[in-house]
Amino acid sequence: MATAVRAVGCLPVLCSGTAGHLLRRQHSLNTLPAASILAWKSVLSNGHLSSLGTRDTHPYASLSRALQTQCCISSPSHLMSQQYRPYSFFTKLTADELWKGALAETGAGAKKGRGKRTKKKKRKDLNRGQIIGEGRYGFLWPGLNVPVMKNGTVQTIAQRSKEEQEKVEADVIQQREEWERKKKMKVKRERGWSGNSWGGLSLGPPDPGPSGETYEDFDTRILEVRNVFTMTAKEGRRKSIRVLVAVGNGKGAAGFAIGKATDRMDAFRKAKNRAVHHLYYIERYEDHTIFHDISLRFKRTHIKMKKQPKGYGLRCHRAIITICRLIGIKDMYAKVSGSTNMLSLTQGLFHGLSRQETHQQLADKKGLHVVEIREECGPLPIVVASPRGALRKDPEPDEVPDIKLDWEDVKTAQGMKRCVWSNLKRAAT
């Protein structure tokens, strides 16, 4: 390959004289071929001129230094060259490490939760939309960015025109902007308990199991989403998401579980897939209410549930309403007092509902018929359960149960709890 030599200035060239002396002449370096320059360099370093005395070798040393510092060999203009520096940090670090440095995610501020404002830069996937073989010069490589065969002939390496290359680059930039715009769009989701709360939202059925079992008749509802932090010696204050969900099929089978992850969607997935493996079966009276009134205390949470007739509805805490719909309970009254911690409330509710006594169990334990008095039937009792064994002859003693009464219930039963607006007379309209 022929090479051309460019010089910054003029360089003294050595010529031989008749008297054995060396003369200096100023010649343009453009007139010297590259081979002669390389020959002069080799002569100065290894030839017979190096054997001269120190007084006469000074001009040759300056010539060698000028050749090494002021000369550069350029390649022809039709060839491309790419700078390669193996010692640069760009070639030693991964893309994630470079993004951490650009976004300042490796300092103490990121560990302490700083930098949450909107001015913070966001990470972009620069590889998205790129095609192997595409570059800024617009070369067409068969098998990479163009087909190998076209119209029955094998294509050769070609290059796009300048206008075509500008159009391709503009299309790529426009496509990336559309992706960013779609990413920023917020999809309107189902309303939960309140406007901007995760509570009460549906996550759909759990994922199919490894053996192929599906849970299409189950539904998952979010009860609580919390940010929790743990202090570690290596990372400092580490943030994670804790999610409490409940699942149920509306036919008595329901359960709950907790999922924790650094990403919110991962926590949702873990919680709903774990809850389906910890199910309770809740007995229901005529598939609409509980069998009897329940009063329980779980830790510092007090829950009092009452059986109600059909059409009463659910008048409870909003989390209890969500869980009862997943179970299949349609009519019930519940009052929560004390702590309203969501985890304690959920555990206490499942603890009480799973331990209720059915009418058949009560009849077998007492050895008597269990009857129900309904308002629409008058004084006629309705038998709802009979003992499987022998019927007991002596009736149940009429003893006053030793239970702690609620003062609010006593006032309601005695008519002492009245609304201040009950006797208000309104003007006729």
Curated annotation (Swiss-Prot):
GO terms for cellular component: mitochondrial small ribosomal subunit. Residues 111-125 have a biased composition (Basic residues). Residues 218-282 form the S5 DRBM domain. PROSITE patterns: RIBOSOMAL_S5, S5_DSRBD. Its main location: mitochondrion. The lineage of its organism: Eukaryota, Metazoa, Chordata, Craniata, Vertebrata. Keywords: Mitochondrion, Ribonucleoprotein, Ribosomal protein. Belongs to the universal ribosomal protein uS5 family. This is Small ribosomal subunit protein uS5m. It comes from Pongo abelii. Component of the mitochondrial ribosome small subunit (28S) which comprises a 12S rRNA and about 30 distinct proteins. GO terms for biological process: translation. InterPro entries: Ribosomal_Su5_D2-typ_SF (IPR020568), Ribosomal_uS5 (IPR000851), Ribosomal_uS5_C (IPR005324), Ribosomal_uS5_N (IPR013810), Ribosomal_uS5_N_CS (IPR018192), Ribosomal_uS5m_N (IPR048584), Ribsml_uS5_D2-typ_fold_subgr (IPR014721). It comes from the Eukaryota. PANTHER family: MITOCHONDRIAL RIBOSOMAL PROTEIN S5 (PTHR48277:SF1). It is found in: Mitochondrion. It holds the Pfam family Ribosomal_S5_C. Residues 108-127 are annotated as: Disordered. One of its GO terms (molecular function) is RNA binding. The keyword Ribosomal protein applies. Gene3D superfamilies: 3.30.160.20, 3.30.230.10.
